[in-house]
């Protein structure tokens, strides 16, 4: 099973990806986690990414694509994986398609979680409150200004992926406003 999760920030992609990976015993591939991993292992790509991040810039698509390609080659991905946070653009989706084809693989589904923007803001506030309540570290991008920027970026860059994957017959749209367990039930139904 090879799956991509799409949805705006706060839509529950990470939660649903985690639930799916636990049930099917396949890895969840998060670009943030993959970046941190290659940086900590001090690989060549990791050193490049670290230098870019330390300079305050965004890691280029070519580096992210290389990291994803390398990660998909690892043995735990033989039976599948769930991509969370990648691809973010149509360009990355096209590269992912090439990467998978070169490995004689293809995506089984792209799951898009649809959530009302007001609900997204409420979810972000709740996440901040819950993090503070347990003495955790609040994410630097969990504030109104940063969150609004992330939503704009999602609309401009990531939302066009819906059309890209719909045209390829891969898109499965799920109402992300339902309870977490109900969303999970609907998603699992795609793979029965």
Curated annotation (Swiss-Prot):
Compartments where located: Cytoplasm
Matches recorded under SUPFAM superfamilies: P-loop containing nucleoside triphosphate hydrolases
Subunit structure: Monomer.
Catalytic reaction equation(s): AMP + ATP = 2 ADP
Protein name as it appears in the record: Adenylate kinase
Segments of this protein annotated with the region NMP: 30-59
Entry keyword annotation includes Cytoplasm: yes
List of residues binding ATP: 10-15, 127, 178
Naturally occurring in which organism (per UniProt): Bartonella quintana (strain Toulouse) (Rochalimaea quintana)
């Amino acid at each position: 099973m090879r799956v991509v999760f799409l949805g705006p920030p706060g839509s529950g992609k990470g939660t649903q990806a985690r639930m799916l990976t636990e049930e099917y015993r396949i890895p969840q591939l998060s670009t943030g986690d993959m970046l941190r991993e290659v940086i900590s292992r001090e690989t060549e790509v990791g050193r490049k990414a670290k230098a870019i991040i330390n300079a305050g810039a965004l890691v280029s698509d070519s580096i992210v694509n290389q990291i994803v390609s390398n990660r998909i080659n690892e043995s735990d991905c033989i039976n599948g994986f769930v991509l969370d946070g990648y691809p973010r653009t149509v360009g990355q989706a096209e590269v992912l398609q090439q990467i998978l084809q070169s490995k004689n693989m293809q995506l089984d589904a792209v799951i898009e979680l649809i959530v009302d923007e007001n609900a997204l803001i409420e979810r972000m506030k709740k996440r901040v409150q819950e993090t503070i309540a347990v003495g955790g570290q609040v994410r630097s991008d969990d504030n109104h200004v940063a969150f609004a920027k992330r939503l704009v970026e999602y609309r401009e860059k990531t939302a066009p992926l819906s059309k890209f994957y719909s045209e390829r017959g891969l898109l499965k749209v799920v109402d992300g406003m339902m309870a977490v367990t109900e969303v999970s039930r609907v998603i699992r139904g795609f793979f029965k």
